[in-house]
Amino acid sequence: MFVVNDLTISTLKGRVLLKDFSMTLNPDDRIALIGEEGNGKSTLLKILAGIDVSSYVTHTGSIFCDEKTAYLPQKIENEWMDETVFGYMVRENHDDEIDYEHYSHYAELYDALKAVNLDASILDDERQLRTYSGGEKVRIAMAKLLYGNPDILLLDEPTNDLDLETLIWLESFISSSSLPMIFISHDESLLENCSNGILHLEQLKRKQEARMTFARLNYSDYVRDRLHFIERNNSIAAKQKAEYFKQIEKYRQIYQKVEHQQATISRQDPHGGQLLKKKMHAVKSLGRKLDEKKENLTERFDPEEAINIFFADVDLNPGKVILDYHLDELTVGERVLARNIELQVRGRDKVCLIGKNGSGKTTLLRMMKDVIMSDDSVHAGYMPQNYDEVMDFDISPVEFLKKEGTREEISRIRTHLGSLKFTAEEMEHDIRELSEGQKCKILLLKLILDGCNVLIMDEPTRNLSPLSNPQVRKMLIEYGGCIVAVSHDRKFIENVCDKVYMLDEDGLHSMM
């Protein structure tokens, strides 16, 4: 049994991340934990796993668990990178001695590796963990969890850095697993195909109020119901507000009329004055009732993930050649990753490069970026996977985005950041203090403010929440310029891109 009662989580500065949360995990639950970056998803998962988080949050309430939980972190810690697969799988901590009893459990180790579609022979391989691809590392980490015979799985963003092939495998693994689990993911396709419950953490009212929604629905149904709720709620709020202002205006007219009558009535008409006094008393009583009514008006629901920005007036000639690229060999060090690479990109093409982890997609995109950005006839912008390549993390978002520093420019930047749900304080924080999702939004805003007509993007949606991603996709679908991107996001590939190329050792191959 796994039961959470009245769990409240707060940062050391007092910001509430979760308030009075209670739930019971059922045997067939596959609960997806969603929310914007920085809302406490990973922190909650660690607390549920019994991991100490006292260095940055406090929590109250109780968690009762009489079953064995297994926790998958976002990444295998660096201290394991020089270890073999066997050494990693049989030790709980890096400094532990290997218990030789594990050698008698080779069958269980083999079974765990086979369960995640890995060749069990890697157990005898002396290769270091660092030499495996991102997808292979995730599978190895999952195999380690399964070797421990857990009753419950807690998975923190297992989709990070996975290629499409491994994503599809992970989807199948989660869907077919007999173990109950709670998992964090930004991948909408995986959420749609795997979840049967949603735990949504939000920070509303400029992060002054925590909101938690727990629904035993799959992701698609949750999004549909949530959208319906927001539309219905905001329609009711708008009608109530309009009716309230009508009543206020009528009240003011009556108040001013009675006030005028009181000021002009003759002192020789005491009876009339008395009647007006009673009338004013009734009018003020109506005013108090309207004040009470204002307190009970339905509040407009402003979704935290709203992204109210867009590219304006970008219009490239469809026939313009943006890139005419040929590369005999794509290499990293002395290793040849691909040969005979050919790609032509024109004005409004939206191109995506896909391929297995380690195939060289990011390296190739950087090389193409250098060619495109050397062309003065286009205005290209670049969003890398690692934002520190183009961002100074030691300055504020406002400092990063400004060019001239005029009062009008800074005011405009603040307005844009506000539309992206940045608080006034966050606008002045060093960028390094912000979440990866917030950094991504700042870079998107820079591409917009710079008026770029060509976007070069490496995994542009990887740090955005699944509820923010549809709005970013809509913005990029409507974008009138050219996009050259690398992505494993199936929704992005299907909805935004009109040309998809697979990179392998023989070059680029058109997929659509």
Where are these regions (language model features)?
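ABC ATP-binding cassette signature C-motif
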Residues: 1-233, 317-512
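Flexible nucleotide-interacting loop at or near the entrance of a catalytic core
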Residues: 100, 230-336
